[in-house]
């Protein structure tokens, strides 16, 4: 299945990307920032920085098991079963909501889109629609179940409302936020929408009139999470200022502040009675706090990494909590009441006044409750009741000097080598020192960069653009191919494009045999067939995705037709018309080496392709200069032995005959001016 928006081929410049990954990505990689639980069917939906939404069959609490050691891998004997993946996003998944009576999942992503999925149990494909109302990262979603409306908010300052029953038609654009929006909440009947973010204030809207109602101030840093009660009278907010604030919406003011956390609070969950809040964030602590008394915060447990998302498995009398963190593991923790924890007051429990305390709606000033050092408490739980293990994510990468291979180190400390042209991992080094392996694989060669690599998804993503993709010419020998022919020139970018579009009919039609190929056609003949599961993405110059498909699907009728409409013209020119840029010319000067004490050194200015080898320059010097110079005596020798009778230098560094001028200039000359070479006969 593919996702596409039609744009003219003559419009803004486009890029193409592909992801190097396993055929089946069963486990989350890196951070998990979005969770939804379908209690009726026992399904958990997870999403995060690896762009993939996964579905898991998980046991109910009565089937929960002792998690000593946790779950190590999905399998027949595991209580957790991987069910499938939803793969259309091209960047981090930030939020998800279940709607349509549990039949529809909506997801929001940094790829600027909101996507709609059919998640009925008998539907394996899922993708319904792609909503492109936003122009920047879509950070959060909210759901009004009574009226079947969904709400999205973005870094583009906009809040949109969609009618689920009308094919997700956009029915409102709530305008008024002046900065990026990080958090969103709505009442079940959509009578009120709250949005907040980097403005440090909370804005309230009435979607029925599209009007701004009020603005709530109090946070001193970004507001990262919002919750509102069903009747729209109270709201909770959490911020990077490490506070949780309770608001009386009627009075338009903060009536209580909780400062139990040490660092930013990023996620909140509240039970259905709006009496208890569960919070977590950067300090890794998961805390339970009764709303009637913010001094009664209890440390439930502490995670191994900052917490991105909390999700109660049920809102009525909750007994467990799903947790997603900056790590790839997902855990379910029991939050059943354990032994009574005494916090404040005397040892017999809270005082009568505290126990009966409720937040007053009077005109009294906001209350900041006494600080309780939650971090000094012993957590009520030490082991999760369920663990869905994640996979290691690539955390560091380096492009090698050959501009074909990328070395990586993952979150487990393992080092691996990837071949970009083949879109595959080709070697595992285990737990080695990264820099040492880079040095082992580095060569004394300069090749222009023709792609950009990033690993923010936990996997390698390779991006090619019009300016650089076809700039990398090199000899077949330098490219590492078996023929070792320095006369045959290859273009890495052209080869990569042929690999990516190999199955697309217009590309197939231009394939030729080596015997019949001209020099331009030979430049891409050695392309490598890629794994069919490789995702291919066409995007705008700013990275906004236009089309996503699998490399193996490019030959299918629907995908082929879409590619014909969306493929960038520079790609079509390269693979359909064999149009590649010409070799770059490089001017350089030749002078006798100062050690030869030339009487009147003549400075010859020449020009050649930047891939010309030093030994070719030596042949020129031998034939045109040394052989006619009465002051220098050289014997008559075969051209292929000239390097035994003379040497070439740049900045007093002796050059290897197999080096090309491009490498000499970038590794030895290192100046903006024209290259200067010295020659010296060997006696």
UniProtKB/Swiss-Prot annotation:
The keyword Repeat applies. The keyword Repeat applies. PROSITE patterns: WD_REPEATS_1, WD_REPEATS_2, WD_REPEATS_REGION. It comes from the Eukaryota. Keywords: Repeat, Ubl conjugation pathway, WD repeat. Expressed in several head neurons and cells in the tail including the anal depressor cell. GO terms for biological process: double-strand break repair via homologous recombination; positive regulation of gene expression; positive regulation of locomotion involved in locomotory behavior; positive regulation of protein deubiquitination; positive regulation of protein localization to cell surface. Disruption phenotype: Changed locomotion behavior with mutants displaying decreased reversal frequencies consistent with decreased glutamergic signaling. WD repeats lie at residues 27-82, 88-130, 133-167, 176-215, 218-257, 260-299, 302-343, 389-428. It holds the Pfam family DUF3337. One of its GO terms (molecular function) is ubiquitin binding. Residues 341-364 are annotated as: Disordered. Residues 351-364 have a biased composition (Low complexity). Transmembrane segments: none annotated. Interacts with usp-46; the interaction increases the catalytic activity of usp-46 in the presence of wdr-20. Belongs to the WD repeat WDR48 family. Together with wdr-20, binds to and stimulates the activity of the deubiquitinating enzyme usp-46, leading to deubiquitination and stabilization of the glr-1 glutamate receptor. This is WD repeat-containing protein 48 homolog.
């Amino acid at each position: 299945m593919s996702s596409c928006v039609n744009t003219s081929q003559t419009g803004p410049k486009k890029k193409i990307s592909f992801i190097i990954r396993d055929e089946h990505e069963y486990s989350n990689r890196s951070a998990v920032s979005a969770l939804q639980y379908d209690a009726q069917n026992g399904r958990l939906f997870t999403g995060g920085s690896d762009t993939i939404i996964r579905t898991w069959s998980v046991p109910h609490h009565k089937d929960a098991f002792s998690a000593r050691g946790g779950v190590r891998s999905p399998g027949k004997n595991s209580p957790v079963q991987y069910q499938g993946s939803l793969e259309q996003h091209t960047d981090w998944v930030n939020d998800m909501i279940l709607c349509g009576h549990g039949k529809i999942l909506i997801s929001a992503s940094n790829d600027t889109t909101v996507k709609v999925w059919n998640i009925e149990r008998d539907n394996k494909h899922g993708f319904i629609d792609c909503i492109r109302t936003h122009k920047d990262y879509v950070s959060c979603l909210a759901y009004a179940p009574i009226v079947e409306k969904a709400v999205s908010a973005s870094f583009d300052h906009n809040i949109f409302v969609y009618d689920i029953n009308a094919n997700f038609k956009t029915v409102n654009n709530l305008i008024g936020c002046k900065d990026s929006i990080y958090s969103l909440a709505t009442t079940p009947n959509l009578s009120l929408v709250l949005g907040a973010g980097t403005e440090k204030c909370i804005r309230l809207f009435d979607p029925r009139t599209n009007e701004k109602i009020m603005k709530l101030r109090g946070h001193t840093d970004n507001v990262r999470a919002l919750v509102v009660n069903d009747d729209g009278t109270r709201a909770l907010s959490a911020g990077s200022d490490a506070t949780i604030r309770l608001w009386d919406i009627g009075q338009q003011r903060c009536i209580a502040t909780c400062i139990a956390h040490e660092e930013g609070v990023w996620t909140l969950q509240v039970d259905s009675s709006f009496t208890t809040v569960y919070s977590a964030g950067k300090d890794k602590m998961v805390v339970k706090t009764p709303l009637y008394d913010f001094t009664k915060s209890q440390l439930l447990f502490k995670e191994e990494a900052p917490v991105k998302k909390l999700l109660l498995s049920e809102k009525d009398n909750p007994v467990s909590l799903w947790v997603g963190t900056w790590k790839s593991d997902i855990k379910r923790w029991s939050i059943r009441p354990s032994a009574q924890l005494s916090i404040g007051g005397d040892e017999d429990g809270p005082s009568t006044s505290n126990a009966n305390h409720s937040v007053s709606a009077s005109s009294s000033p906001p209350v900041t409750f006494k600080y309780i050092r939650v971090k000094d408490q012993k957590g009520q739980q030490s082991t999760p009741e369920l663990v869905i293990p994640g996979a290691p994510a690539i955390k560091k990468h380096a492009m090698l000097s050959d501009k074909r291979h990328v070395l990586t180190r993952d979150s487990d400390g393992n080092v691996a080598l990837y071949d970009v042209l083949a879109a595959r991992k080709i070697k595992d080094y285990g737990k080695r020192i990264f820099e040492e392996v880079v040095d082992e694989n580095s060569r004394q060669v300069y090749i222009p960069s023709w792609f950009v690599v990033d690993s923010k998804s936990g996997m390698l993503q390779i991006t090619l653009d019009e300016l650089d993709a076809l700039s990398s010419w090199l000899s077949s020998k330098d490219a590492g191919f078996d023929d070792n022919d320095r006369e045959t020139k290859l273009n890495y970018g052209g080869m990569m494009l042929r690999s990516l579009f190999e199955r697309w009919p217009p590309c197939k039609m231009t394939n030729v045999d080596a015997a019949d190929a001209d020099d331009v056609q030979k430049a891409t003949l050695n392309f490598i067939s890629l794994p069919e599961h490789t995702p291919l993405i066409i995007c705008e110059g700013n990275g906004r995705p236009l089309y996503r498909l699998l490399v193996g699907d490019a030959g299918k009728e629907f995908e082929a037709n879409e590619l014909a409409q969306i493929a960038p013209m520079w790609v079509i020119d390269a693979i359909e018309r064999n149009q590649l840029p010409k070799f770059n010319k490089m001017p350089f000067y030749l002078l006798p080496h100062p050690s030869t004490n030339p009487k009147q050194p003549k400075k010859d200015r020449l020009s050649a392709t930047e891939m010309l080898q030093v030994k070719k320059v030596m042949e020129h010097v031998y034939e045109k200069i040394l052989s006619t110079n009465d002051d220098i005596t050289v014997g008559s020798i075969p051209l292929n032995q000239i390097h035994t009778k003379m040497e070439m230098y740049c900045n007093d560094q002796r050059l290897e005959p197999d080096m090309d001028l491009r490498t000499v200039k970038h590794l030895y000359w290192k100046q903006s001016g024209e290259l200067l070479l010295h020659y010296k006969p060997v006696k």
